[in-house]
Amino acid sequence: MQTANKVSQQQLTGASGQQITCLRFNGDISSVSRDAVVGTYQALDKASHKHILLDFKGVEYLNSSGIALVIQVLMEANKSGQTVAICGLTPHFTKVFTMVGITKYAALYPDEAAALSAL
């Protein structure tokens, strides 16, 4: 599934054999990306998508409005009892995500392989 070339969805398998839904973000993530980012997440059946990986490797630009969208997804996932991990952030955004408290809701990994080995 792909939404306006901003988000693609893929099923992966974690190290423990569990199914992980990977949402791969691409291009610019800002307030105009709401439908792509939040809408794609909200379209998932929460009961069958218990483990989510948010991959930012393809993101070229992410502003504070985009970070707010990520936080919205994380808050909804937390309420639904889903496990969320994040990978593919630049060193700068790893620092920003840590500073704004995103690590309270999702573990950060340098890449997909590291995330899958931990999930």
Segments (PLM) and residue ranges:
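Amphipathic alpha-helical interaction surfaces in cytosolic regulatory modules
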Residues: 28-106
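STAS-typified acidic loop motif
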Residues: 2-39, 56
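Short, ordered loop/turn segments at secondary-structure junctions
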Residues: 89, 112-113
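Short acidic-hydrophobic, aromatic-tinged amphipathic segments that line or gate anion-handling sites
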Residues: 107-111
